């Protein structure tokens, strides 16, 4: 029988903690596939903080860390400076990277820290009930914007 699919080596052989239909599992799997194709898995320091993105360290076989809520860029900065040969990858949600943790994200970028930040932007605080976040589009109805959001969103990638 021809093998048409196999688990990428950097993904742990564990059940996913993510909800059915959620994109986190696919995003993390895609990241692991790219890291494996680049042959840098041994150099990876995979990090995150609160929220669903923090579960990503349980399904990968990378050296990993979780930080206090919204402080992943600050913790990662210290890790990178102490281990300059490491490849530091942060997996954060929009609430973590662009709302509550925007200051840490912005200042790490402004300092030119050698970090890779992957932001899973679902435009809401998904884990706590679907409240509007800083990236929620104008007009979007959430549990806290029943008439539609009136606040222009932050475009983190810009």
List where the protein language model places each region.
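Catalytic-loop motifs flanking and including active-site residues across diverse enzymes
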Residues: 23, 27, 71-75, 152, ...
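Flexible, glycine/proline-enriched loop segments at strand-loop-helix junctions
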Residues: 17-21, 91-95, 140-149
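Short Gly/charged-rich anion-binding patches and loops
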Residues: 30, 103, 155
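Conserved thiamine diphosphate
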Residues: 6, 133-158
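Generic secondary-structure signature for well-ordered alpha-helical cores
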Residues: 24-27, 33-40, 81-84, 110-113, ...
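Glycine-rich, charge-decorated loop segments at or immediately adjacent to ligand/cofactor-binding or catalytic sites
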Residues: 126-132
């Amino acid at each position: 029988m021809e093998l048409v699919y196999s688990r990428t080596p950097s993904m742990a052989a564990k059940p996913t903690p993510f909800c059915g239909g959620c994109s986190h599992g696919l995003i993390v799997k895609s990241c692991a596939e790219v890291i494996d194709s680049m042959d840098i898995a041994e150099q990876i320091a995979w990090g995150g903080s609160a929220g669903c993105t923090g579960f990503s360290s349980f399904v990968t076989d990378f050296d990993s860390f979780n930080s206090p809520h919204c402080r992943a860029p600050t913790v990662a900065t210290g890790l990178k400076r102490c281990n300059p040969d490491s490849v530091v990858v942060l997996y954060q949600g929009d609430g973590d990277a662009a709302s509550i943790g925007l200051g840490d994200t912005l200042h790490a970028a402004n300092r030119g820290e050698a970090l890779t930040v992957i932001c899973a932007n679902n435009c809401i605080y998904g884990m706590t009930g679907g409240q509007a976040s800083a990236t929620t589009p104008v007009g979007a109805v959430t549990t806290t914007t029943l008439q539609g959001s009136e606040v222009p969103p932050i475009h983190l990638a810009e």
